[in-house]
Amino acid sequence: YPNTFWMNPQYLIKLEEEDEDQEDGESGCTFLVGLIQKHRRRQRKMGEDMHTIGFGIYEVPEELTGQTNIHLSKNFFLTHRARERSDTFINLREVLNRFKLPPGEYILVPSTFEPNKDGDFCIRVFSEKKADYQVVDDEIEADLEENDASEDDIDDGFRRLFAQLAGEDAEISAFELQTILRRVLAKRQDIKSDGFSIETCRIMVDMLDSDGSAKLGLKEFYILWTKIQKYQKIYREIDVDRSGTMNSYEMRKALEEAGFKLPCQLHQVIVARFADDQLIIDFDNFVRCLVRLETLFRISKQLDSENTGTIELDLISWLCFSVL
């Protein structure tokens, strides 16, 4: 299942020293890998059986040697075969195999046999000689565009549209925004949506509300409109099966297209928060996720002016940010 296999956790194994005793006459580094399912007794009491599990071991390409912050993509696994695999995928508590490989760097990828199975596990690696093991994951990055636009960017047609939508007060509230976006999405056949929830509209307004009015003026609405068009473009391009929705395994690529690189742990949280019980993410939840991420990254950047990677919050600040 290439669409989802690459989303599994990835572990770097660095084999540095060959075995001293080459019993079979073949040089290399001997090591054991054990993949163990956790909490299965508890799950069995709930009527769930063991998952069918196994793993693959891939040689790290020369151009990526020495890097630990790159989660290998779907394209890598489509173009590279496993150097070794577990003997079988089987529904046992532990899968254990012995291997011998030349010194070098390898990626270990555990997985269930069937896609979209969630499970807890631990991995044990024993080597005859010195070796190093660590998790491989993306560094946290956000490429944020400036939330600004000049008056010259806004054409007369958009000004007339805004005046028609905003009414006498020349501002758009979250409730008015919800009505506008519902009409827009109702005309689209390539995106399945019941419209935007009022919660999503509120966080969009909050992100761009520069004067604290809880409404959007002309320039603010123009910036938001531009963002929504960008989000629509990403959503359509990532929806490769043309279902009008997005599968959870497509979300990681979509976030990267939107400028966010996130570790696996955070991707798991995002899927749990924004996907439905069929692991589908609709356009409303996709936009809500992007807006929340952008808002949190901007807050972090503002509070961490020296780019240390840490921030300090007092209780009231934490509570205010938590209700975003």
Curated annotation (Swiss-Prot):
Key word Translocase present: no
Keywords: Calcium, Cell membrane, Cytoplasm, Hydrolase, Membrane, Metal-binding, Protease, Repeat, Thiol protease
Domain EF-hand, first and last residues per copy: 190-224, 226-261
Transmembrane stretches, start-end: none
UniProt subcellular location: Cytoplasm; Cell membrane
Free-text remark on how the cofactor is bound: Binds 7 Ca(2+) ions.
Organism superkingdom: Eukaryota
SUPFAM superfamilies: Calpain large subunit, middle domain (domain III), EF-hand
Transmembrane helix found in the keyword field: no
Entry protein name: Calpain-2 catalytic subunit
Source organism: Sus scrofa
Gene label: CAPN2
